[in-house]
């Protein structure tokens, strides 16, 4: 599924005639006790890319909430420009609602709480800095959790877990712009009913 998503995104990106720009995540290990495997696992758990490839004109989706900067997880937009000012880089994005923002890299911190007497101290173990966006032509159901998507085309060919269909369809904020897509060569109604998996514990609870 990830391969299919990546292929769609790269295919759409390749059709843009603007130059390709790559941003690599900047990782800093502040505590030498942290093992590389532990650090890698933490980075993979974040909703960002270690290597972000974009072009001006690309459709993107925001991957975190940043109330102060006026962008939210699941919002979409188009890259208008990439600006280099002294030692800073900004990505100019026009969101679907028409608002224009200058996006800066976002820093995630790996932290632990340490008790010091009666107080607790926050220790920073590591950090990773990256632009919190991804290409938005396609995304997996798992990665879409928590997002609100305005225009959604949902491919239901690979539904296999309880509640997965609900997670996928409930991302849509507007039923009028929701499209359900399947390439299965069987009756759609039969297939849809078959993948509408409900956990037995939920059924038992509502009896």
Predicted feature residues:
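RecA-like helicase/translocase P-loop NTPase motor core
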Residues: 1-207
């Amino acid at each position: 599924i990830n391969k299919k998503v990546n292929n769609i995104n790269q295919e759409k990106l390749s059709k843009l005639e603007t130059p390709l720009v790559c941003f690599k995540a900047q990782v800093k290990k502040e505590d030498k006790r942290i093992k590389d495997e532990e650090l890698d696992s933490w980075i993979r758990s974040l909703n960002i890319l270690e290597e972000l490839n974009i072009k001006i004109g690309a459709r993107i989706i925001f991957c975190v909430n940043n109330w102060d900067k006026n962008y939210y997880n699941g919002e979409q937009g188009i890259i208008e420009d990439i600006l280099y000012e002294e030692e800073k880089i900004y990505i100019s994005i026009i969101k679907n609602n028409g608002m224009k923002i200058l996006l800066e890299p976002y820093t995630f911190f790996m932290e632990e709480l340490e008790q010091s007497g009666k107080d607790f101290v926050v220790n920073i173990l590591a950090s990773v800095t990256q632009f919190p966006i991804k290409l938005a032509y396609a995304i997996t159901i798992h990665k879409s959790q928590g997002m609100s998507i305005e225009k959604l085309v949902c491919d239901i060919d690979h539904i296999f877990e309880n509640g997965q269909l609900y997670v996928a369809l409930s991302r849509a904020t507007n039923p009028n712009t929701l499209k359900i897509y399947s390439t299965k060569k069987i009756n759609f109604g039969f297939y849809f009913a078959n993948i509408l998996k409900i956990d037995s514990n939920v059924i038992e609870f509502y009896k």
